[in-house]
Amino acid sequence: MADQVEEKKRIKTVKDLSGVGQAVLNKLTEAGYSTLESIAVASPQDLSTAAGIPITTAQRIIKEARDALDIRFKTALEIEQERASVKKITTGSQALDGLLGGGIETRTMTELFGEFGSGKTQICHQVSVNVQLPPERGGLSGKALYIDTEGTFRTERIKAMASALGLEPKEVLQNIMSIRAINTDHQIAIVEELQDIIAKDNSIKLVVVDSITSHFRAEYSGRENLAVRQQKLNRHLHQLVRLAEIYDLAVIVTNQVMARPDMFYGDPTVAVGGHTLYHVPGIRVQIKKSRGNRRIARMVDAPHLPEGEVVFSITNTGIRDAEE
């Protein structure tokens, strides 16, 4: 039994499946079987034909993929036990942590959406620092990967936040790996490479994409490009969610908003990305400007958390509770 559990943990990608060498891997990839999920739902005949392998080998590969993904019915008690091991990263504000059920969760995607200057990037910077704190201080003693699509990542801000927490700024910077994504294809390619990077360094506990939609929105404008954009965005988001689930890490994505001219009452802004982005993130939080350095966070959607609003502040030292 222990050997089966260990084998399940070892299988992370298609190339980890027994009997899948480089030649078979190349054939599977060319035929569209590049993920464990695609293999798990394939028929033995299709897989055998695509990779040029015997039916019995295809059956074994499919079974291994299904076992690795733990595709089976589970009791509610098993699911509760799995949920109990989910970890949280503090945001720096007790009020915001409370809204999130204790902080930014691992094994899921948290979306922060709001207008320009609302504080989304500030939260991303803060959590990239806080993930490095020990568990007793609200962190995971881990590292962060930061995908910057808008050129807003600032080391000066990271150092100020680190110093405020009594951390060595240079060490904190060393534990944050950042890359500037220059367009949609580059952004997608970066995420596709993340699995290899994270598999080699299990101390990575946070992935940030700031922002998830800016390149998609700029490059796929117009109704005629909407279907292609949504398909690419959907696949991109699911790759990130899969990383969160496999490697027990937190994923934060930020998103822009746009005005709806048909709204005559209430908040006229909605998140960019349509239904694709409404359904994929496990937790969706809207960030709004308030007076001065205060911001309002509103829980929009989470299956296990109630709707609500809290106020927090963006200070010189980082994200903090709002002073009364």
UniProtKB/Swiss-Prot annotation:
List of residues binding ATP: G114, E115, F116, G117, S118, G119, K120, T121
InterPro entries: AAA+_ATPase, DNA_recomb/repair_Rad51_C, DNA_recomb/repair_RadA, DNA_recomb/repair_RecA-like, DNA_repair_Rad51/TF_NusA_a-hlx, P-loop_NTPase, RecA_ATP-bd, RecA_monomer-monomer_interface
Signal is among the record's keywords: no
SUPFAM superfamilies assigned to the protein according to its UniProt record, in alphabetical order: P-loop containing nucleoside triphosphate hydrolases, Rad51 N-terminal domain-like
GO terms assigned for molecular function: ATP binding; ATP hydrolysis activity; ATP-dependent DNA damage sensor activity; damaged DNA binding
Pfam families linked to this entry: HHH_5, Rad51
Keywords from the named record: ATP-binding, DNA damage, DNA recombination, DNA-binding, Nucleotide-binding
SMART domains in UniProt: AAA (SM00382)
One GO-annotated biological process of the protein: DNA recombination
Family: Belongs to the eukaryotic RecA-like protein family.
HAMAP family documented for this protein: RadA_arch
Function noted in UniProt: Involved in DNA repair and in homologous recombination. Binds and assemble on single-stranded DNA to form a nucleoprotein filament. Hydrolyzes ATP in a ssDNA-dependent manner and promotes DNA strand exchange between homologous DNA molecules.
UniProt protein name: DNA repair and recombination protein RadA
Naturally occurring in which organism (per UniProt): Metallosphaera sedula (strain ATCC 51363 / DSM 5348 / JCM 9185 / NBRC 15509 / TH2)
